[in-house]
């Protein structure tokens, strides 16, 4: 089928992994000759890349999908695709619920989108959710940014947290080879990208499935080794990585982050709960004390590092005292940013079937109290930037304030200052911070271009 001059639209829900997958699928569609439109109602192909981590994200997908399903009833040539975790979780049930769908595909099939669409355009309704080895993608992604890029280094998850659906929908861990990662990053450097964020569901588990061990018995390939391997790629000025699991986070990794100047001083390490009994019920594989030891080591090597995390309140059986333990941990650590959520039962997870579920009223109250503490702490942490000069990598314009550009500090703080985007995009600028809010900064450029 000739699809040149046809338009596509992708709507992405959920995590950074999904955003990276969407960029790759967009690249595949453009390689087929399609062009992007920001209006889904003008698109010939609409793709929803979905998230099932929480029920509200899943329900939002069905709301969006219903509108396009009605459109397809009068425009049968429209191609409707659901990708990602909801697709993997629901499979053929999605077709029964939304018979207008043409393609249902799990995240392991993102790199096969063109092959699956060939089947669709030949007249088939396709469901692709079987587990398989993730193909190394040779298609150029359509990156949303021209400055910062995602690079997947490990897919899947081998953990079995009692509340989490991710292992069921993203499959087992599959690490890419260091050579493949290095090659992709070299291309990014040649294209002018300045910052790369290495991605993985549990990124510090990277390499456990790759062959080889060192004489001391550790895995031959680790995230630490990979950082050293890619650090000197010319043109890439900044390196980040996410998301880290406390079980695999090592002092050796922290030391590497201190030693390697391109690695930014920002760590995202979810703790989920500050109570040991809840952590055990969650099957997280570490204790409160273990988590605090990690934070202490980070502070020892990199005192000013920014630390962010994920936390869940209202887990089945959580008492008020156990919730207070979570609040106490937050106060003890001093996080720069926390992604917060009330527990949401997910299909096929053990915790969803327990009979000690908390009421929505209790979960909502605890989430509100948690968010108040998070905002207060973020504001307090922001104050340390006042009067300091921070290196800001310019990523774009501040669309709400003409004449301002926006970028991020090495600690991942969104920062605004006056400047011309045509001159500054992709440049690192020293900015003196004059205003600090809970989750962003404003400053004045001391020099318009340093790199």
Swiss-Prot record:
Residues 6-122 form the MTTase N-terminal domain. The gene is miaB. Keywords: 4Fe-4S, Cytoplasm, Iron, Iron-sulfur, Metal-binding, S-adenosyl-L-methionine, Transferase, tRNA processing. Monomer. It is found in: Cytoplasm. It comes from Synechocystis sp. (strain ATCC 27184 / PCC 6803 / Kazusa). One of its GO terms (biological process) is tRNA methylthiolation. The keyword Cytoplasm applies. It holds the Pfam family UPF0004. One of its GO terms (cellular component) is cytoplasm. Residues 143-384 form the Radical SAM core domain. This is tRNA-2-methylthio-N(6)-dimethylallyladenosine synthase.
């Amino acid at each position: 089928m000739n699809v040149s001059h046809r338009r596509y639209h992708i709507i992405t829900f959920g995590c950074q992994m999904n955003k990276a997958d969407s960029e790759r699928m967009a690249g595949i569609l453009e390689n087929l000759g399609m062009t992007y439109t920001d209006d889904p109602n003008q698109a010939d192909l609409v793709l929803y890349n979905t998230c099932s981590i929480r029920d509200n994200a899943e329900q939002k997908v069905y709301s969006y999908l219903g509108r396009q399903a009605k459109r397809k009833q009068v425009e049968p040539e429209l191609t409707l695709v659901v990708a990602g975790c909801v697709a993997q979780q629901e499979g053929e049930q999605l077709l029964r619920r939304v018979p207008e769908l043409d393609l249902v595909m799990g995240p392991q099939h993102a790199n096969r989108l063109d092959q699956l669409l060939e089947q669709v355009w030949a007249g088939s309704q396709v469901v692709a959710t079987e587990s398989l080895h993730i193909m190394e993608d040779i298609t150029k992604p359509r990156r949303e940014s021209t400055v910062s890029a995602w690079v997947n280094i490990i897919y899947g998850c081998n953990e079995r947290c009692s509340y989490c659906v991710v292992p069921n929908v993203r499959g087992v861990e599959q690490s890419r080879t260091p050579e493949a990662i290095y090659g992709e990053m070299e291309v990014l450097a040649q294209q002018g990208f300045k910052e790369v964020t290495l991605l993985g569901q549990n990124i510090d588990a990277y390499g456990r499935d790759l062959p080889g061990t060192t004489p001391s018995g550790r895995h031959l390939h680790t995230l630490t080794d990979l950082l050293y391997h890619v650090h000197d790629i010319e043109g890439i000025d900044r390196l980040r990585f996410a998301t880290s699991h406390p079980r695999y986070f090592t002092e050796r990794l922290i030391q590497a982050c201190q030693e390697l100047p391109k690695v930014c001083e920002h760590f995202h390490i979810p703790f989920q709960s500050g109570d040991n009994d809840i952590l055990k019920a969650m099957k997280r594989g570490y204790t409160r004390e273990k988590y605090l030891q990690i934070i202490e080591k980070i502070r020892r090597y990199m005192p000013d590092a920014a630390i962010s995390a994920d936390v869940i309140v209202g887990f089945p059986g959580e008492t008020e005292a156990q919730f207070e333990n979570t609040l106490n941990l937050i106060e003890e650590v001093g996080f720069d940013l926390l992604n917060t959520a009330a527990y949401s039962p997910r299909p096929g997870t053990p915790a969803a079937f327990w009979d000690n579920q908390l009421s929505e009223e209790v979960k909502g109250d605890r989430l509100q109290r948690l968010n108040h503490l998070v905002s207060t702490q973020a504001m307090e942490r922001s104050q340390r930037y006042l009067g300091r000069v921070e290196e800001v990598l310019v990523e774009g314009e501040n669309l709400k304030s003409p004449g301002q550009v926006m970028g991020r500090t090495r600690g991942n703080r969104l920062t605004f200052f006056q400047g011309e985007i045509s001159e500054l995009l992709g440049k690192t600028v020293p900015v003196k911070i004059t205003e600090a809010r809970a989750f962003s900064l404003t400053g004045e450029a001391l020099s318009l271009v340093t790199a």
